[in-house]
Design a protein with these regions (language model features):
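N-terminal beta-strand motif that seeds the catalytic metal site of vicinal oxygen chelate
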Residues: 1-24, 83-88, 136
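Vicinal oxygen chelate
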Residues: 1-6, 97-136
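Core segments of cupin and vicinal oxygen chelate
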Residues: 14-61
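Short, conserved charged micro-motifs
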Residues: 22, 94-98
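A short, acidic/glycine-rich surface segment
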Residues: 38-40, 70-75
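Short beta-strand micro-motifs in enzyme catalytic cores
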Residues: 48-52, 84, 116-118
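Conserved beta-strand in the GNAT
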Residues: 63-66, 128-129
Length: 136
């Protein structure tokens, strides 16, 4: 698989997931994030609380993947109150096309490059978008 393209903005997003290990593997393999810290049931948190803090090496964007004790395993839905989607900015239409190809290589279904946007979903059905500003 080719090396991951770049992001430009967003510092940290905390996402509730059903399986922090599975999600951290996906965010690493598909988007190129790296694990900074993991907490799987340490004494600092309840034993059923899992947390993985990840960082993208180029942009410095951080995500937290958190499995909460009260999560009953239901998939994400943007139709409930809370997060609708996460949008990451890329530098150019060319970089957006590189991302489309990378998603294809990883077997991740996506919208294809529509104008200046590609949308896809993570293992918990959270919608992610890659966007580049149109030339002015």
């Amino acid at each position: 698989m080719t090396s991951p393209p770049t992001f430009e903005r967003v510092m940290y997003v905390g996402l509730s997931v059903t399986d922090a290990r599975r999600s951290s593997a996906w965010y690493a393999d598909v988007l190129g994030f790296e694990v900074e810290r993991e907490n799987f049931g340490s004494t600092a948190r309840p034993s059923d609380w899992d947390e993985v803090l990840m960082r993208h090496p180029h942009s410095g964007i951080r995500i937290g993947l958190l499995r909460h004790p009260s999560n009953n395993g239901a998939p994400f839905s943007e139709f409930r109150t809370g997060l609708d989607h996460v949008e990451l900015e890329v530098a150019s239409p060319r970089e957006l096309e590189r991302w489309r190809r990378r998603l294809d290589e990883a077997g991740v279904p996506h919208s294809g490059a529509r104008d200046y946007l590609v949308t896809f979903r993570d293992p918990d059905n959270i919608q992610l978008e890659l966007f580049c500003e149109p030339a002015r």
